[in-house]
């Protein structure tokens, strides 16, 4: 008959095994954890995890062994390194560059119109007030709607 200590020990092993199994991806199913999968490889991995726990290994050691044997994709939470950072940050960087190019083009377009207006009145003998009036007439007004969405 099992003692109370043996029952507690089995419960601890089972709890740790389930916790680890929920964080390990089934290599056949891909979208399921090995805890939820009934594939042969998932059953074998669950047994391997329980054996490793019984032999006294820590969770971290078990994760490292699984990662070494099956690759980084077996874990649902891969380590965060330079490559992972590049993958996650690339959309933000591309969006920032696109916004910068768009803003530069808008600024350049406004500046070019002002420079063309100055070039038109450059050689003409005008008083400062006439020159200012000509620039006001030749320079287009800023757009009335500054929001990208018309309802604002």
Curated annotation (Swiss-Prot):
Quick one: which gene encodes this? CCMH
Q: Which organism is it from?
A: Oryza sativa subsp. japonica (Rice)
Q: Where in the cell is it found?
A: Mitochondrion inner membrane
Is Repressor among this UniProt entry's keywords? no
Q: What is this protein called?
A: Cytochrome c-type biogenesis CcmH-like mitochondrial protein
Q: What is the lineage of its organism?
A: Eukaryota, Viridiplantae, Streptophyta, Embryophyta, Tracheophyta
Function, as annotated: Plays a role in mitochondrial cytochrome c maturation. Probable component of a heme lyase complex involved in the reduction of apocytochrome c.
Record keywords, A-Z? Cytochrome c-type biogenesis, Heme, Iron, Membrane, Metal-binding, Mitochondrion, Mitochondrion inner membrane, Transmembrane, Transmembrane helix
For the Mitochondrial matrix compartment, the record's topological domain ranges are: 105-152
Q: Which Pfam families does the record cross-reference, listed alphabetically?
A: CcmH (PF03918)
